[in-house]
Design a protein with these regions (language model features):
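OB-fold single-stranded nucleic acid-binding module
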Residues: 23-34, 46-50, 54-96
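OB-fold nucleic-acid-binding modules
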Residues: 1-16
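Acidic/His-rich, divalent-metal-binding segments that scaffold phosphate/diphosphate chemistry
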Residues: 94-213, 234
Length: 345
């Protein structure tokens, strides 16, 4: 589609084109008037959008809309002021331009996980992790890792998990005394229960959280899924590695403030927490840099509680680069294709 990418929006430009509605609500202002408040996106990024006409019905979440708008700025952050909006008709747009996607094929990322399971020598962990991947099923191929924060993209859960797995391989070259099977198992299963926590369509757009997700959350549900997988594989629930894996799931947020009722209590659990945090924050920062010009600070990012600076990197253009999903994704070696790559990572 021939239209301006969200990642390259600048203040005062006019925009007419197609975008995907990630959130869509009718709200009431302090003076009692109604307005539309939406998050609209293409595959390069998203932007908050307002339409000050309270008579317009909010488009369904996940719908493609055609808008005519102007890019404004509010509290140092770009915002879209919509003048006209309508739902798009099939055939008017190219969905591949609108859906944020992981930069690598889902099948390739999934192969990295199954390769790690095949490498395991611990039969208990191998059986449990393999069964949990089977329990996740086809939804794992398209599910995002979050609704709005890190890896909020089609196949984002696989992107997050496979990136963490490569980071874990690198960590093991520095700390070879860690239990590789236990660390790999924790990485692969730690967020699988997000599939039960969120409602996502096949485009990777999360419309809401499930009742299960709101009442229990993915940490608690993850523990029950580890135990269920062990039961299915006829592994006693008092087997120590079952308990260790349950602890890794419930402690991977690190602190009670962030949802973990127990802090990590053994080295592999501690390492899982930091690998998870590093990968999530690097993904967020990468997205922030793509929409922030070199030499400028971003708006305050509430999830990081700070602004982020985009340095003048050598050889980089001043304008924000398009998101990786908008380019041809760099090809990574497959898990079984490059032993030198595996040795380094």
């Amino acid at each position: 589609m021939d239209q301006i990418a969200v990642a390259t929006f600048e203040k005062d430009i006019k925009f007419e084109g197609f975008l995907l509605a990630r959130t869509s609500d009718q709200r009431t202002s302090s003076n009692g008037s109604k307005y539309l408040d939406m998050t609209l996106c293409d595959r390069t990024g998203d932007i908050n959008a307002k339409m000050w006409d309270g008579t317009v019905t909010p488009p369904p979440v996940g719908a493609v809309v055609k808008v005519r708008a102007q890019i404004t700025e509010y509290n140092g952050r770009l915002q879209m002021k919509i003048n006209k909006i309508r739902e798009a008709q099939e055939g008017e747009y190219d969905l591949s331009f609108l859906v944020p996607c992981a930069p690598y094929p889902a099948e390739e990322m999934y192969a990295e996980l199954t390769q790690a399971v095949a490498e395991m020598r611990n039969e208990t962990l191998q059986k449990i992790v393999g069964e949990m991947l089977r329990m996740a099923g086809e939804r794992l191929m398209y599910y995002p890792a979050a609704q709005r924060l890190h890896h909020a993209e089609r196949s984002g859960l696989l992107h997050h998990t496979s990136s963490m797995l490569r980071l874990a391989r690198a960590v093991l070259t520095v700390y070879p005394w860690l239990d590789q099977d236990l660390l790999f198992a924790g990485v692969i299963v730690h967020d699988l229960s997000k599939i039960a926590e969120m409602k996502s369509d096949e485009a990777g757009n999360v419309t809401d959280y499930t009742v299960d997700g709101l009442l229990l959350g993915h940490l608690v549900r993850g523990v029950t899924q580890v135990r269920e997988a062990a039961r299915r594989m006829e592994i006693p629930e008092d087997e120590e590695y079952v308990l260790l894996l349950e602890h890794m799931v419930i402690s991977h947020h690190g602190e009670a403030e962030y949802g973990s009722p127990r802090p990590p209590m053994f080295p592999e659990a501690e390492m899982l927490h930091w690998i998870d945090l590093v990968d999530a924050r690097m993904n967020e920062m990468n997205g922030i840099l793509r929409r922030t010009p070199a030499g400028a600070f971003s708006e305050k990012i509430w999830s990081l509680d700070r602004r982020v600076y985009h340095p003048h990197y050598a050889g980089e253009q001043d304008a924000p680069s398009p998101a990786p999903a908008a380019q041809e994704a760099p090809r990574r070696p497959r898990p079984d294709a490059d032993k030198a790559y595996q040795g380094l990572l």
